[in-house]
Swiss-Prot record:
One of its GO terms (cellular component) is membrane. PANTHER family: LIPID-A-DISACCHARIDE SYNTHASE, LIPID-A-DISACCHARIDE SYNTHASE, MITOCHONDRIAL-RELATED. GO terms for biological process: lipid A biosynthetic process. SUPFAM superfamilies: UDP-Glycosyltransferase/glycogen phosphorylase. Pathway: Bacterial outer membrane biogenesis; LPS lipid A biosynthesis. Belongs to the LpxB family. It catalyses: a lipid X + a UDP-2-N,3-O-bis[(3R)-3-hydroxyacyl]-alpha-D-glucosamine = a lipid A disaccharide + UDP + H(+). Keywords: Glycosyltransferase, Lipid A biosynthesis, Lipid biosynthesis, Lipid metabolism, Transferase. This is Lipid-A-disaccharide synthase. Condensation of UDP-2,3-diacylglucosamine and 2,3-diacylglucosamine-1-phosphate to form lipid A disaccharide, a precursor of lipid A, a phosphorylated glycolipid that anchors the lipopolysaccharide to the outer membrane of the cell.
Amino acid sequence: MAFQLTPLRVALVAGEPSGDLLGASLLGGLHARLPASSRYYGIGGPRMSAVEFDAHWPMEKLAVRGYVEALKHIPEILRIRGELKRQLLAEPPDAFVGIDAPDFNFGLEQALRGAGIPTIHFVCPSIWAWRGGRIKKIVKAVDHMLCLFPFEPELLEKAGVAATFVGHPLADEIPLAPDTHGARIALGLPGGGPVIAVLPGSRRSEIELIGPTFFDAMELMQQREPGVRFVVPAATPALRALLQPLVDAHPSLSVTLTEGRAQVAMTAADAILVKSGTVTLEAALLKKPMVISYKVPWLTGQIMRRQGYLPYVGLPNILAGRFVVPELLQHFATPDALADATLTQLRDDANRRALTDIFTDMHLALRQNTAQRAAEAVARVIDSRKPR
């Protein structure tokens, strides 16, 4: 496949931090693969902007989680999508890449595809876990799906959607053997007792719902395991300010509150208490025992429960096809239960060794040079639509 030297235009939309990570990885591959001076623009975050991406809107405008919570933001989100659609139809890009955010991207992709613009979607929605009816939207909206997990292309191809397994960029980024000692030195935690990383979420609403419960669990853990130390990474300065009162309300805790540096915090840990999400995959790639938890508003939880197919929500369990780490969700996420489960993960050396083997196999399966594979797939789609 050979492109002429004419620069291309690729529009991309990412709606949350995990999409920003994927988008930055893809952009790195596209810069290497497509002609120089090609233009990349749309909606993205700071990681994408750092690799020559022109963000017309910040992704924070789209980063709303949950059914009930999203209602008040719908008018602005629809306005942004409508304006972006008009721009892209008026000046069609050579390809559009929607990165996750299916509720935003599928409607946009369907309109663009109908106008003859090639559409690629990066991250297959978890149709194998819940809301399987979305496959009908995928068929209408997507020319090609870039899949993070190896079992997804077969499911899509049965429905008539072209797909490529590209692996996960975190598996490329994270070393197979994490440097726990080096991470502790970086955080100022070189000696002393065991370390537990606590990650209550990357959104204000998540921290407000589960943060107090996590900190109460930390208090119980310190009572039951004297000498234990905690590190709590905050994704942004605003979230650090939100977490600080929880730290102040528990003065007896030995806790280090950081800004950013979530991967360093998890690398430094002996065990992790984590709110469900992509970060659980990161914890698995770091070979760490963990407890996965979440709390969402009651109505959101009821909707999610009724539309789910699998008995687990954490990516490590989904990829393993069984429970390999505990999940404590909704009303089961009490301080006592979280403390007990996390300390069990901390203390069980046989379980730690077994998890290391399981997570190493996952790591190797997902380590595929994602940036290059994804960029090659995008290039093939663009090339297939060029006049011969």
